[in-house]
């Protein structure tokens, strides 16, 4: 039986116009999320505060999941890209407040510079039971 594919396109965050990707692609019960960064909606820039950036990032991920009637608990895999791995513990303090057990599989990956000067980029895969 062929899978049904529903492509969800949400305009690029921060008012940067139409970028050449979908914010998520839903295939059957699996939702593939693009990379999200934590831009301040008022300034369209990365906030000075690391904590605020993390919260904006996680809120963006949560809000995208809600568009297909999923929650953070539906995430099965998450990848976080970060040019400064010394922020690992600070990221974890806030990240953990968005989940209850069981937690998704996860990688925190040291990376090169991220777009718009972001400190973090997150992408994930969610599956609806």
Give the positions of each predicted feature.
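N-terminal presequence-like segments and the immediate start of the first folded domain
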Residues: 1-59, 63-76, 82-129
């Amino acid at each position: 039986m062929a899978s049904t594919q529903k492509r969800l396109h949400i305009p690029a965050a921060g008012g940067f116009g139409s970028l050449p990707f979908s914010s998520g692609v839903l295939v059957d019960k699996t939702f593939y999320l693009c990379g999200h960064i934590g831009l301040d909606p008022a300034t369209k820039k990365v906030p000075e505060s690391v904590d605020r950036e993390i919260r904006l990032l996680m809120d963006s991920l949560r809000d995208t999941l809600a568009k297909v009637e999923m929650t953070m608990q539906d995430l099965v895999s998450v990848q976080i890209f970060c040019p400064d791995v010394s922020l690992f513990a600070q990221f974890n303090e806030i990240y953990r407040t968005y989940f209850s057990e069981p937690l998704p599989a996860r990688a925190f990956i040291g990376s090169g510079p991220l777009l718009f000067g972001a400190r973090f980029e997150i992408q994930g895969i969610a599956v609806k039971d």
